[in-house]
Amino acid sequence: MAIWQGRSLKKPSGGRIVLARKKRKRELGREPSNTRVAEQDKRKIIRTYGGNRKVRLTAAAYANVFDKSGKGRKVRIIRVLENPANRQFARRNIITKGAIIETEIGKAKVTSRPGQDGVVNAILLEE
C-alpha cells in the first residue's frame, strides 16, 4: 500500500474532514531505505518528482571521514555504535544522519543522509 503524505483526514476533535479534491501523485511517499552496514556498497537510483533522480544507499561498507583540519579519508565501517533516531537502529546496524559509527580510524558521527544522498560522510570524534 502506498504512503500518503497529505493532510490528515481527522480534526483534532476526532471528526472527519471531507477533502474538496482527490489525492495527488506528488503527495505519495516511499518506504525508508534503512541503510545497513554491509561488505559492499549497494545503491538504488530512484526517479523523483519532476523527473529528477535520487541515489539511495541501501548498504554501506565505506564512509568518507573528515578530521578537524578538513582532511578526508575513505575508511571501512565496522558497526553502528549508537543512533539517536532510534535505539533499535544501532542494534540492527542501520545508518542515518547523526549516527555514531565505528570505523577503522575511530568513532565518527554521520553528517550526510545516506538514504537521500547515496553516500556516508562523517566527522571524526575526539576520543
Curated annotation (Swiss-Prot):
GO terms for cellular component: ribonucleoprotein complex; ribosome. InterPro entries: Ribosomal_eS8, Ribosomal_eS8_CS, Ribosomal_protein_eS8_arc, Ribosomal_Se8/biogenesis_NSA2. It holds the Pfam family Ribosomal_S8e. One of its GO terms (molecular function) is structural constituent of ribosome. Keywords: Ribonucleoprotein, Ribosomal protein. It comes from the Archaea. PROSITE patterns: RIBOSOMAL_S8E (PS01193). Part of the 30S ribosomal subunit. Belongs to the eukaryotic ribosomal protein eS8 family. This is Small ribosomal subunit protein eS8. It comes from Pyrococcus horikoshii (strain ATCC 700860 / DSM 12428 / JCM 9974 / NBRC 100139 / OT-3).
